[in-house]
Amino acid sequence: LYRLLNPKKCSLKHTLVHRHALIDALLARSTCRQVVEIAAGFSPRGCMVSADQAYRYFEVDLPEVIALKRKRLEESVAGRVVLSRENFKLLVGDITTLDFLLHFPKAPTFVITEGIMMYFKRDAQLAIWRNIAQFLRVHGGEYVFDYIPLEDEPPRSLPGQLLSDLRQRLVKPPPP
């Protein structure tokens, strides 16, 4: 039963690849042509999407991350091509203040925070979400994120609750 609930083929790598692909699909369906990826890290999404000149792509991260990504992109011909695009920008910004959001052109914007929100305490998450909501009220657009705090999950159905309880019992470590 454990293998049924946790198949080995469902690794963290597969989960991350599927999450990334889902966000890519949502972006492809969106009418927004301005994208702001907050805490982009080494995501290749901006490099790929900005190949289409119809998009303006802004990657935002901490200074050290932006410097390292720029350095890595400068090391290859393909990376230098990406950096030379007018519609691709690497920007320094702090997700906890979101002051950088004030400087984007006013256009419907697709905002992404992938793989970052889980690292913040509840109060910080709410502040970030309020800032992004305010930005989208002015610019219009969509917000995609991959994290729902447990206290905000909808209640499970009875079968879902039973499966969850059973799963927790199965994966519970044995007593010492």
Show where each model-derived region lies.
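Alpha-helical subdomain
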Residues: L1-P176
